């Protein structure tokens, strides 16, 4: 018995297949999945290629912190790198709340910020001072005497004399973000 589909069944496996796409994305990490979703939203025929599993590369080792440029401002000046990241925390939070360019409502927010601290060494104090001035709108300095009780207990030793900073940079569960984007 034959049918019209026999030619497909009998086709050699190594036969070339023509595939026409507008955008080819290589890498199935968070950046690749984000780009895939945005390109598809814009109406592009898009294909994503991943040699292993989604999130198997660098994404697997990520801490999930959505940086807003704080770590790049530790030199005491705003750089192109720090400025290009300035809006990322807000952008991700908006997506997590269901009001952004992508739907990340199924992702898991682990923390709305994280902590940095400086010691009493001269270089640490200078770095902390300049970073706090440059990043004034993106982090809040926490005076160790007045705000110490609001810190996690590990950061409350009586003999600590440094300064705490709380960059407003959220942390997400990386694997839940991958699931939300996939």
Question: Which residue stretches match the model-derived regions?
Answer:
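Glycine-rich FAD pyrophosphate-binding loop
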Residues: 40-61
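Dinucleotide-binding Rossmann-like beta1-alpha1 core, especially the glycine-rich loop
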Residues: 64-151
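Beta1/beta-strand and adjacent pyrophosphate-binding region of the FAD-binding site
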Residues: 15-31
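Helix-loop-beta segment of a Rossmann-like dinucleotide-binding subdomain
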Residues: 147-180
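N-terminal Rossmann-like dinucleotide/flavin-binding domain of flavoprotein oxidoreductases
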Residues: 81-82, 178-182
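A short, basic/flexible loop-to-alpha-helix module at the beginning of a structural domain
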Residues: 1-20
């Amino acid at each position: 018995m034959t049918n019209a589909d026999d030619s497909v069944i009998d086709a050699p496996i190594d036969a070339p297949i023509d595939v026409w796409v507008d955008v080819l994305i290589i890498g199935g990490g968070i950046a690749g999945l984000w780009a895939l979703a945005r390109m598809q939203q814009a109406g592009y025929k898009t294909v994503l290629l991943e040699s292993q599993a989604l999130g198997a590369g660098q994404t697997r080792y990520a801490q999930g912190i959505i940086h807003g440029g704080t770590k790049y401002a530790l030199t005491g000046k705003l750089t192109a790198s720090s400025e290009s990241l300035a809006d990322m925390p807000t952008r991700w939070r908006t997506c997590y709340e269901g009001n952004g360019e992508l739907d990340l409502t199924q992702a898991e927010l682990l923390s709305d910020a994280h902590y940095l601290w400086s010691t009493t060494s001269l270089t640490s104090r200078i770095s902390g001072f300049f970073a706090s001035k440059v990043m004034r709108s993106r982090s809040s300095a926490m005076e160790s005497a007045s705000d110490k009780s609001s810190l996690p207990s590990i950061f409350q030793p009586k003999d600590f004399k440094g300064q705490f900073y709380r960059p407003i940079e959220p942390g997400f569960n990386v694997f839940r973000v991958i699931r939300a984007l996939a």
